[in-house]
């Protein structure tokens, strides 16, 4: 299958997608009623889009093209209000978090959607297990070559994005000992992790053509890489973050990615090389397992440094770009988070350590998303 031409978009514009949990009180397990909820909200939307994801316990909130994080926040806030209103009418709850802490994957119903049914046929039970919830951020690019450079540049900071957003310590009723267990779900997929090495858009088109020979790839959407180009939108899409518990944190993560993209494309601090990825999966694992307490290893020098320290360095590097984009509030909030030494996974464990239950944890997450 031929690859679409790269659509020219305004550099650094944003699009944000949030995969949300649809909850069934009072037991606070995942509901299988997302279709009912989506049908109820479609006519009420004034901006953005609310749509299905893989299973009937998920729904996706997606902004339109936004010039800055303030516009994105306004769209997401409006959608949040509409969804919460409809959820209340149908006696459902909505929350963030990268995993539901005690749902059973065997109970998950794949949406009655041609693409998802085809994916179920290809991947079997792996698709039901992929009832996990992430935040995706699109950043606009002027051309395909810029998109490939940006993808390689952002790949340096995949551990940082994972650690800052980690919100999935519990799965199937157990503490996984990971800060972000969500990404482990995709480890059995053949396209898990980083995109195979290419140096420009022409090479990427050749890569996509060869991947399509497998008959498992019909479009870019069928590729589950950590970061992928989206030629139809003219963007690079970062896909490694857990869905946050709050809209504010989702906006802060988007602001960081937007500012990092601006810094990368204006300063060009790296000359991408295939060896950059030599320790990619090791550093990614450190972020998933330990969050901000993880340790990064430099593929060239062997130097090791705390992820928290390197994240502060990233935040300092992108601060001038954030000011130009109106995203400095996001950088300030994330800097404070790192200095306090926590993420949402840590909060969840503290809730349980203080005597809370997993049912109570999901109830609390619904209250947090509703602003209670």
Swiss-Prot record:
**Cysteine-cysteine disulfides:** none
Q: Which reaction does it catalyse?
A: L-cysteine + L-glutamate + ATP = gamma-L-glutamyl-L-cysteine + ADP + phosphate + H(+)
| E.C. code | 6.3.2.2
Show the Pfam families listed in the entry: GCS2 (PF04107)
Q: Which InterPro entries match?
A: GCL_type2/YbdK_subfam (IPR050141), GCS2 (IPR006336), Gln_synth/guanido_kin_cat_dom (IPR014746), YbdK (IPR011793)
Q: GO molecular function of the protein, one example? A: ATP binding
Q: Name one GO biological process term.
A: modified amino acid biosynthetic process
- Supply the alphabetized keyword list: ATP-binding, Ligase, Nucleotide-binding
> Quaternary arrangement and interactors, per the entry?
Homodimer.
**Role of this protein:** ATP-dependent carboxylate-amine ligase which exhibits weak glutamate--cysteine ligase activity.
Q: Under what name is this protein listed?
A: Putative glutamate--cysteine ligase 2
Write down the species: Salmonella paratyphi C (strain RKS4594)
Q: Which gene encodes it?
A: ybdK
């Amino acid at each position: 299958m031929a690859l679409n031409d790269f659509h020219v978009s305004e550099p650094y514009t944003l699009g944000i997608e949030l995969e949300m949990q649809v909850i069934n009180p009072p037991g606070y397990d995942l509901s299988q009623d997302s279709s009912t909820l989506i049908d109820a909200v479609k006519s009420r939307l004034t901006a953005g889009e609310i749509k299905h994801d893989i299973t009937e316990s998920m729904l996706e909130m997606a902004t339109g093209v936004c010039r800055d994080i303030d516009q994105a926040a306004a769209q997401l806030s409006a959608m949040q209000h509409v969804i919460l209103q409809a959820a209340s009418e149908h006696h459902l709850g909505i929350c963030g978090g990268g995993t539901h802490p005690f749902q059973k994957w065997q109970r998950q119903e794949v949406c009655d959607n041609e693409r998802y049914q085809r994916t179920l046929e290809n991947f079997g039970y792996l698709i039901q297990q992929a009832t996990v919830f992430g935040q995706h951020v699109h950043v606009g690019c002027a051309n395909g070559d810029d998109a490939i450079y940006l993808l390689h540049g952002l790949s340096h900071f995949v551990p940082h994005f994972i650690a800052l957003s980690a919100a999935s310590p519990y799965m199937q009723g157990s503490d996984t000992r990971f800060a972000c267990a969500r990404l482990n779900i995709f480890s059995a997929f053949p396209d898990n992790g980083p995109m195979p090495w290419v140096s420009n858009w022409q090479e990427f088109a050749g890569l996509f053509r060869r991947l399509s020979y497998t008959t498992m790839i019909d479009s870019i959407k069928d590729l589950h890489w950590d970061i992928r180009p989206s030629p139809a939108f003219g963007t690079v899409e970062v896909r490694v973050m857990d869905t946050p518990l709050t809209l504010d944190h989702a906006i802060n993560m988007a602001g960081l990615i937007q500012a990092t993209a601006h810094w990368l494309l204006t300063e060009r601090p790296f000359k991408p090389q295939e060896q950059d990825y030599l320790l990619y999966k090791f550093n990614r694992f450190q972020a998933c397992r330990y969050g901000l307490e993880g340790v990064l290893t430099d593929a060239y020098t062997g130097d090791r440094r705390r992820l928290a320290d390197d994240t502060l360095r990233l935040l300092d590097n992108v601060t001038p770009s954030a000011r130009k984009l109106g995203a400095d509030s996001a950088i300030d909030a994330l800097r404070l988070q790192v200095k306090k030494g926590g993420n949402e996974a840590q909060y969840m464990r503290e809730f349980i350590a203080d005597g809370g239950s997993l049912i109570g944890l999901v109830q609390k997450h619904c209250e947090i998303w509703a602003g209670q």
